[in-house]
Swiss-Prot record:
Regions that span the bilayer: 37-57, 63-83, 98-118, 123-143
Record-linked InterPro entries: Vesicle_transpt_Got1/SFT2, Vesicle_transpt_SFT2
The encoding gene: Sft2d1
Protein name as annotated: Vesicle transport protein SFT2A
GO cellular component term, pick one: intracellular membrane-bounded organelle
Amino acid sequence: MEKLRRVLSGQDDEEQGLTAQVLDASSLSFNTRLKWFVICFVAGIFFSFLGTGLLWLPNGMKLFAVFYTLGNLAALASTCFLMGPVKQLKKMFETTRLLATIIMLLCLVFTLCAALWWRKKGLALLFCILQFLSMTWYSLSYIPYARDAVLKCCSSLLG
């Protein structure tokens, strides 16, 4: 219907940018986006808990690192369904969350490197902890004044 309105009003598809055309062609209904958000988010939680359970098995560090990272990636992908991938990427790299985004993405990569290539269990566990903390800090950036509240709580506890 929107395309018909654009054609009737004199706006051609040629006037739209390529990105807008691709996003228009691949847009999902709100119900579909909500369903996929829930599916990805639940899968992310499942993979994270599965990875945590595998940590206690003999030689389970590799599986822990892989599944925990996969869980975080699925949780991150879930928000792409709510706001769209382009908008999500733009928000991720805004100045308010740029540092948290970079640290989070580096920790995802370093967790896998430490577990799979470097074979350093302690380092993989450290990167998983940093991954959790950076993902939490990144998520708090979407809630107004949440970071300030956390900083005030931590500073009052420490001194």
